[in-house]
């Protein structure tokens, strides 16, 4: 019945609604028929093991590591001291590994990184998210402002010590050149090593790409959320990084000042828009999968996101065509039994139900619009169309008790629902498929997979 609807409507939609926008093919999803995934990347093992509080993550379609641990087969995150000899200064002013990349042995770093990857990800068949979290310095000289200016000063002194005969201007030029060369080598070679050792993983750096659209505090009434032109240019200059990444991990953390505001959506939307742009320019064969990092609680607080801000984060991410979203959390989540219960109550309530809503809606749209061979993406990225279950057609039912739950989605897609999807969304076909509804095999692309 539903396929007949598509056949009957296809010609009309093509002539009247299809806006001719080309969408680059996507890599097939990590799990079959799961176009939008939600990951849990928080150290909440103690909730279950120590406090006997089961967070019910899998019940609500949330992908998690064994025992809800921070790192494992689903997602592994490498902090500065967990991977090789990352040169940096930590938040307490402690020096590590020569401080600046040009003052540390890359070979020694890579050798240690190899051991660390084998320790943290023992299986070569790992196909989860591999996230490198190096935030202390940025590989571009001009982006090391504020507290990161210390890396420029250290680099200048390093060049001065090695070349005292040079003028001050020559020293500064040399310092910038040597810093950016070494920073690029550290980041690029570490990434390539990880991909060589665990080739099925989704590898990238946390907070890349960034957008620097944080000016919502200074002039909230004039805030547009747009990425400054200079930051877009700087992101273009990082093409070497995007080409060697196999996934992108921007962040869309919301502060309380953005709570339930239009600015929250603007902030998230433009960060995602820039990430999707980078994802499409990184490769020629398919767009990189994008997995933005979000928090279930407002940044630096233990206050849960409002339902409106769940839409502004999870909902916006799915509608923009991302492959998924990662919820990061701190040790506070599992610090006490009360903390665990607070997290559990939020998951059992608004958070879990909304995740089920969006993941199911994304799957339904992929099934009926893209024949399971693609994911649904907004036709117009700035529209307010979301991948939500239609409330008149579907219900989310939660059965069970405090120790065991089961979530069931009941309902069926009606004709008017399908028309809404066709009018507002288009298919981003997975590799090996093409056509308006991803209904045609693409032999050339199949050979590349």
Curated annotation (Swiss-Prot):
PANTHER family: HYALURONIDASE
EC number: 3.2.1.35
Covalent S-S links between cysteines: 47-340, 211-227, 365-376, 370-427, 429-438
One GO MF term attached to the UniProt entry: hyalurononglucosaminidase activity
List of glycosylated residues: 67, 103, 111, 153, 357, 401
Keyword Transport carried by entry: no
PROSITE patterns in the record: EGF_1 (PS00022), EGF_2 (PS01186)
GO cellular component: cytoplasmic vesicle; extracellular region
Lineage of producing organism: Eukaryota, Metazoa, Chordata, Craniata, Vertebrata
Name this polypeptide is given: Hyaluronidase
Record organism: Crotalus adamanteus (Eastern diamondback rattlesnake)
Catalysis: reaction(s): Random hydrolysis of (1->4)-linkages between N-acetyl-beta-D-glucosamine and D-glucuronate residues in hyaluronate
Its job: Snake venom endo-hyaluronidase that degrades hyaluronan to smaller oligosaccharide fragments. In venom, it is not toxic by itself, but increases the diffusion of other venom proteins by degrading the extracellular matrix. In addition, it displays antiedematogenic activity.
Enzyme class: hydrolase
Location within or outside the cell: Secreted
Family to which this protein belongs: Belongs to the glycosyl hydrolase 56 family.
Expressing tissues: Expressed by the venom gland.
One of the GO biological process terms: carbohydrate metabolic process
Active-site positions on this chain: 135
Signal peptide: 1-23
């Amino acid at each position: 019945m539903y396929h007949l609807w598509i056949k009957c409507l296809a010609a009309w939609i093509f002539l009247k609604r299809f806006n001719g926008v080309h969408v680059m093919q996507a890599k097939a999803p990590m799990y079959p028929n799961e176009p939008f995934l939600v990951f849990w990347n928080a150290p909440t093992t103690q909730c279950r093991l120590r406090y006997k509080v089961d967070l019910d993550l899998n019940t609500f379609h949330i992908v998690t590591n064994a025992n809800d641990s921070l790192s494992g087969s689903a997602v592994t995150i490498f902090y500065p001291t967990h991977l090789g000899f990352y040169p940096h200064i930590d938040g307490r002013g402690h020096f590590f590994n020569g401080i600046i990349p040009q003052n540390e042995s890359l070979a020694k770093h890579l050798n240690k990184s190899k051991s660390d990857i084998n320790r943290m990800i023992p299986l070569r068949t790992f196909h989860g998210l591999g996230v490198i979290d190096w935030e202390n310095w940025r590989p571009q000289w001009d982006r090391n402002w504020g507290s990161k200016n210390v890396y420029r000063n250290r680099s200048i002194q390093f060049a001065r010590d090695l070349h005292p005969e040079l003028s001050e201007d020559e020293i500064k030029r040399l310092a910038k050149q040597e810093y950016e060369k070494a920073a690029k080598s550290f980041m690029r070679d570490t990434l390539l090593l990880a991909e060589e050792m665990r080739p099925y993983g989704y590898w990238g750096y946390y907070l890349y790409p960034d957008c620097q659209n944080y000016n919502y505090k200074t002039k909230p009434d004039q805030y547009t959320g747009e990425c400054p032109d200079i930051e877009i240019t700087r992101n273009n200059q990082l093409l070497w990084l995007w080409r060697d990444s196999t996934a992108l991990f921007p962040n869309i953390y919301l502060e309380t000042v953005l709570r339930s505001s239009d600015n929250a959506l603007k902030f998230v939307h433009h960060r995602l828009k820039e990430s999707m742009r980078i994802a499409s320019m990184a490769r020629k064969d398919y767009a990189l999968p994008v997995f933005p990092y979000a928090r279930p609680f407002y940044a630096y607080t233990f206050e849960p996101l409002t339902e409106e801000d769940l839409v502004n984060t999870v909902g916006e991410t799915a509608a923009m065509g991302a492959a998924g979203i990662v919820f990061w959390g701190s040790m506070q989540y599992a610090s006490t039994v009360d903390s665990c219960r607070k997290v559990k109550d939020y998951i059992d309530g608004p958070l879990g139900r909304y995740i089920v809503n969006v993941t199911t809606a994304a799957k339904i749209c992929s099934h009926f619009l893209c024949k399971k061979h693609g994911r649904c993406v907004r036709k117009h990225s700035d529209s307010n169309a979301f991948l939500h279950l239609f409330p008149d057609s579907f219900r989310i039912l939660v059965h069970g008790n405090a120790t065991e739950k089961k979530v069931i989605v009941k309902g069926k897609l009606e004709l008017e629902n399908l028309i809404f999807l066709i009018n507002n969304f288009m298919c981003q076909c997975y590799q090996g498929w093409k056509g308006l509804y991803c209904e045609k095999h693409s032999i050339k692309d199949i050979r590349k997979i």
